[in-house]
């Protein structure tokens, strides 16, 4: 099979977001009239969040208001449920309440916080890998390996073309 970056992308190609919980599919809600192996071909303009780019199951980005809200909710619950221990109280007497936590201590045993994933792609943003010199209804056909950025900081990447392998018949 050809290298992904040189392969045309069709409806149901797999995509991944660097801030998402899982992979999902790239979808085409209305065909452009061009098909590859009976599957609608995608273009660089097929980059609309929640239309072409579907939910990745959850979002880890703290730039996402949903994730930030969940983090704030958890922090408040922890502060209410876990007042200072006796040791913390004694240490506070000697340190004035200042306790430095190392990065490793802060990361150990802390689960990642997840919010609602709503892919938010700025209007007019296009995928970054199209087939130049070829047009599908005036738009460049989309090629594999293309990337797109969500406003919440996630990098969305096409990881399969979506094309079904031929049987050779």
List each model region and its residues.
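Intrinsically disordered, low-complexity proline/glycine-rich segments
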Residues: 1-169
């Amino acid at each position: 099979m050809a290298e992904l970056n040189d392969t045309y992308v069709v409806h149901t190609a797999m995509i991944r977001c660097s801030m998402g919980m899982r992979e999902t599919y790239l979808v085409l809600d209305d065909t452009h009239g061009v098909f590859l192996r009976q599957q609608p071909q995608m273009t660089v303009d097929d980059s609309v969040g929640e239309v072409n780019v579907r939910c990745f199951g959850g979002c880890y980005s703290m730039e996402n208001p949903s994730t930030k809200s969940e983090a704030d909710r958890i922090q408040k619950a922890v502060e209410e449920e876990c007042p200072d221990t006796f040791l913390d109280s004694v240490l506070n007497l000697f340190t004035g309440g200042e306790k430095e936590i190392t990065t490793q201590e802060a990361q150990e045993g802390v689960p990642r916080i997840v919010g609602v994933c709503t892919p938010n792609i700025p209007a007019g943003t296009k995928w970054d890998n199209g087939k130049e010199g070829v047009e599908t209804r005036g738009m460049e056909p989309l090629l594999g390996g293309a990337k797109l950025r969500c406003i919440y900081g996630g990098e969305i990447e096409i990881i399969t073309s979506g094309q079904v392998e031929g049987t050779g018949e």
